[in-house]
Swiss-Prot record:
Name of the protein in question: Calcium up-regulated protein E
Organism taxonomic ancestry: Eukaryota, Amoebozoa, Evosea, Eumycetozoa, Dictyostelia
Keyword list, A-Z: Cytoplasm, Lectin, Membrane, Repeat
Major site of localization recorded for this protein: cytoplasm
UniProt topology in membrane: Peripheral membrane protein
PANTHER family linked: CALCIUM UP-REGULATED PROTEIN A-RELATED
Family, as annotated: Belongs to the cup family.
Induction: Induced by high levels of extracellular Ca(2+).
Cellular component terms per the entry's GO annotation: cytoplasm; membrane; nucleus
Disulphide bond pairs: none
A single BP term in Gene Ontology: response to cation stress
Function according to Swiss-Prot or TrEMBL: May play an important role in stabilizing and/or regulating the cell membrane during Ca(2+) stress or certain stages of development.
Length: 758
């Protein structure tokens, strides 16, 4: 039985079990959303595979895949929607291509979902889904859409719809940029490099989350503060409803707002309280970037006004022929053509005269002029984006060669490099927003929407991240292919908009919003030179992130032991110990200053680089310099680093045979190093096990590390063949494996990245 889910509930449940994959290929994803609302008239309900809810409608349990032949699949593709044997309730089963009750018709005109087996319609009965004859009730009305994602990963923030008296935007932030728990959540002005904005309600510290603070004078209004992550705590779980209100799962009728006057009071505290109405602007928030374009192209198509017969067709054909100087009698077919001037067409339409045989030319003139105006502005937006993107990659080959020389890698070799294209381009958009928050989100809006559009438009429905493993000799070709794909995605998205009246109208509206509105596509007054400079530096950093692990790793010495540091250019020290960057096979050969200057002089965080946080993925070796005894055998060992590239805090347990080496926490977008010394055997293969769970103790992945010691050599390290088991919803990327050194006495290192599948 399938349920309608109230967004006041929460769960970590997903499909109960994985069955054999179906063979029918999904076409696109959508979420079926009922127009029926809860008793508070704020909370919407969604079609869901679970009897509880997970924060927002884009979660996997509420995302569905519609195949060309009318099957409705769960997001994983393992189950289809069917009518139960009793002919009343709806259930999830395996695909049966001969069953008509598994085939549905989505009527976007009347907002109905009809079963082809019995002719009945999807309906609601006490929050359960069933099928019933057509009855005209609102409970049979559904809107199909694909909600644009809210910011994920290590970027994005939430800003209030309320402006101050000087039209400045303000967003959720942490008092004094504190990284300590139990700190007040306040409003801060949206400005460049304000890094303590909230992202997915997990701070940049990794495990601090938004929580409910004390009540204000014993009322039902509460302060908000930061706190450590607590498993299954509904007070730390949040959702966004259709009114752009951020509600709490424990108090579903209470939403985040603020008390005080923006720009006047020295501190404006954020609170959890009851909105005065669904339109209370002090309780409405915008996720920046908004991906408003992604949302537009996900909506139900809306055709242009039809002129298909009689006088209507004759008038349209005459005007088209006149405007295009006889080129075509269907002017709309040229909206996507790059070889025509829509501006000239507009002039011709405006100056067109009406012969006696044409009776309704004026009506057509106004409609086609509007269409041309919309199309001209939409094309201009995408032309500006294409110009920015082309310039960003115009020096790609030269820049890559120069970096390779600094990092000392041979670009003609067959050495393998790991990369993630999405991470690279996302870092560019994040840099632009960080430096130019007012307006910078426009570039991110287009770029991220184009990327999402391309993924959904692809023939395959791959759920993994955009990671790749390629030889250095083929790296540039691979990057160039990614660049061309991104340009093609933007082009296809533009053409989709230009061929749809509803999408084109809505996109045109965004072109004239104020630039400080995150949904805006208004590029008037843009400083593209500044944007390009910021983007170029960000992309350069992304290329360094990709190439650096091919020749360098981090050498970690725990606090209290000697570490030979002679320059801050290649070292970092904190309370846990000293981190030194050096070549993989020589711990005494450090990166040149010309390379490190490209990092530290461009604002890159040393902590992030040396601890492999966010976009940095350097494997870490453990070494005890000039030590004897057990530490002198460090070369026999290998030490794992688990990189958590998700928004879910994790931990992993390392066991060496019957010995439990330790439990290690891994914050979101951080890396966790198992630096605890353990016993190793003699020559040959030795194994230790890694079990990764999320902070709620749900399994993520299990694997065995093979630590192979040969005579007078440092250990070779790898993941044991066939040992990797990954839970649904996660992907384990290509590990970075570096050999230890017998002569220099350092351990082997292995970094294992874990992603959330899309």
């Amino acid at each position: 039985m399938i349920n309608i889910e109230d967004i006041s509930k929460s769960s970590n449940q997903s499909e109960e079990k994985q069955l054999k994959s179906t063979s029918s290929k999904p076409k696109y994803s959508f979420a079926a959303k009922s127009l029926f609302k809860g008793s508070n008239n704020i909370t919407p309900y969604y079609l869901s595979t679970s009897n509880t809810f997970q924060c927002v409608a884009s979660e996997s349990i509420q995302t569905w895949l519609l195949s060309d032949d009318g099957h409705i699949f769960t997001s994983s593709g393992n189950f289809v929607l069917d009518v139960s044997s009793g002919g009343y309730f709806v259930e999830l089963v395996q695909l049966n291509s001969n069953s008509k009750t598994q085939i549905w018709t989505i009527d976007t005109t009347n907002n109905k979902i009809q079963n082809q087996g019995n002719g009945k319609y999807l309906d609601i009965d006490n929050l359960n889904i069933y099928v019933a004859p057509l009855n005209g009730n609102a409970t049979q009305q559904w809107t199909t859409f694909r909600r644009a994602p809210i910011p994920t990963g290590n970027w994005g923030y939430f800003q209030s719809k309320q402006l101050d008296s000087n039209n400045n935007y303000w967003g959720l932030s942490v008092l004094n940029n504190s990284t300590s728990y139990n700190t007040s959540v306040v409003m801060n002005k949206v400005q460049a490099k304000s890094i303590k904005r909230w992202s997915h309600f997990i701070t940049f510290g990794g495990n601090l989350v938004l929580d409910i603070g004390p009540s204000i004078n014993g009322s039902k209004t509460y302060y908000l503060n930061t706190n450590v992550y607590k498993a299954n705590d509904l007070m730390q779980q949040w959702g966004i409803n259709e009114n752009n209100q951020i509600f709490n799962q424990y108090y579903p009728n209470l939403c985040i707002g603020f008390v005080g006057e923006l720009g006047v009071d020295s501190t404006v505290n954020c609170v959890l309280a009851q909105p005065s109405s669904a339109c209370d602007i002090n309780f409405q928030w915008i996720a920046n970037p908004t991906y408003s374009l992604n949302q537009i192209v996900s909506e139900v198509p809306e055709q242009f006004p039809a002129y298909t017969s009689g006088d209507l067709l004759a008038s349209y054909q005459y005007l088209s022929d006149d405007a295009t100087n006889g080129y075509t009698d269907d002017i709309r077919s040229l909206y996507t053509s790059i070889n025509v001037s829509l501006e000239n067409f507009y002039v011709n339409v405006t100056n067109a005269t009406c012969p006696s045989s044409i009776h309704q030319l004026k009506i057509f003139q106004n409609q086609i002029k509007n269409e041309l105006t919309y199309a001209i502005n939409v094309r201009l937006v995408f032309d500006n984006y294409s110009g920015f993107y082309s310039k960003l990659f115009s020096q790609g080959s030269t820049n890559l060669t120069n970096l390779a020389n600094l990092i000392n890698v041979d670009m003609s070799s067959d050495q393998v490099v790991n990369g993630n294209y999405t991470d690279a381009i996302t870092s560019v958009f994040y840099a632009i927003i960080s430096e130019i928050p007012i307006g910078g989100s426009i570039i991110a809006n287009i770029g991220e929407s184009a990327e999402e559009f391309g993924e959904l438009d692809a023939e395959s429905n791959d759920s993994g991240p955009s990671t790749y493993q390629v030889t250095l000799s083929k790296l540039y070709d691979h990057l160039n292919e990614n660049y061309e794909n991104e340009m093609a995605n933007a082009q296809r998205m533009k053409n989709t908009i230009l061929q749809d009246w509803g999408m084109m109208s809505k996109t045109f509206t965004l072109c004239f919003l104020p630039t400080n509105n995150p949904s805006s596509l208004n590029m008037n007054g843009f400083d593209f030179q500044k944007i390009s400079s910021i983007a170029s530096l960000a992309y350069l950093t992304a290329m360094i992130q990709m190439l650096l692990p091919t020749n360098y790793q981090i050498y970690f010495t725990p606090a209290g032991y000697y570490a030979p540091v002679s320059s801050d250019d290649y070292s970092y020290t904190d309370s846990t110990g000293t981190y030194i960057m050096a070549e993989i096979d020589n711990c005494n050969s450090h990166p040149p200053k010309a390379l490190t200057d490209k990092l530290w002089k461009n604002g890159v965080s040393k902590q992030e680089v040396f601890t492999s946080s966010y976009g940095w993925n350097l494997a870490t070796s453990v070494t005890y310099y000039n030590m004897v005894g057990k530490y002198g055998g460090m070369f026999k060992l290998s030490f794992p680093t688990v990189k958590n590239i998700t928004s879910v805090p994790m931990q992993f347990v390392m066991t060496n045979g019957s010995d439990r080496v330790g439990t290690f926490n891994v914050k979101t977008h951080f890396a966790g190093l198992a630096s605890t010394y353990y016993n190793s055997g003699a020559l040959g293969h030795h194994y230790y096990d890694i079990a990764v769970t999320d902070i709620d103790r749900n399994k993520v992945a299990n694997f065995t590390v093979d630590n192979n010691l040969e005579a007078l050599e440092g250990s070779y390290v790898s993941i044991k063949t066939n040992s990797l088991v990954v839970q649904p919803g996660y992907v384990v990327g290509n590990p970075t494996c570096n050999q230890g050194s017998f002569s220099q006495g350092f351990a082997a290192s292995i970094l294992i990245p874990i992603y959330k599948s899309n």
